[in-house]
Amino acid sequence: MKRGRQMLRADGLSLRFGGLQVLDDLSLTVGEGRIVGLIGPNGAGKTSCFNCLTGIYQPQAGRVSFDGRDVSRLPTHRRAAAGMARTWQNLGVIDSLTVTENVMLAQHQRTGYSAVAGLLGLGGTWLRERELRRDAAEIIDYFGLGEVAGVRASELPYGVRKTCDMAMALASDPKMLLLDEPASGLSPEEAHDLAGTLRELRDRLRLTILMIEHHVPLVAEVCDYVYVLNFGRLLTEGRPAEIQRHPEVIAAYLGGAAATAEGGEDGTA
């Protein structure tokens, strides 16, 4: 995918663990303001790809560029500070904290001081903390979490905790969201609501989104473009409708789900 300005680019990523080739010369690009899907069967290398993009893993070969800058050697926190925000398949929320506390904790990635310093009001941070609390309330309301703002994450249903996880990602004021199976564990109604949220984040906030997802109807509905991995390699790429018809994709991953997935061309030029 080469149209428009590139927000994220990976070139020739190769990752090995001992004798296991996890990623094999993988390249992809994500254009600014687009929603791009990363799909494939279990063990295809999707999460390992995310780990390389965000700096958790250091690949043996390849490079990663973000917002026009080579970030290949930057640690995870520096990439986050540059504007990458990630959600996790197993959630990044802290169960012992309330929704508000989780969101405010995520905000501290962009404050220049620690959450502990903010909690204690050290160095005049109390004024900034007041601003953060106001911003956190706006984010919480945006995601419809106002009624549970003071509830500990451990007491919330799984779907609500996933929404909290996304609110935390947005709280870091990112340029790009990397979402790891955002629809996992959601009901069909919740997945439909998620699709609307993702489109609004793209259209209203101009966020760029790359998401790993097994929920084929969601991918078909919201993604402008899709990359398909299999055994650590790029199997194919294209618009959702093209991917759904691709015989190798059907054989490797989609199977009968392709016939029932709704959605067509993405409507982009």
Regions found by a protein language model. Give the residues of each.
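Glycine-rich phosphate-binding loops of nucleotide-dependent enzymes
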Residues: 2-269
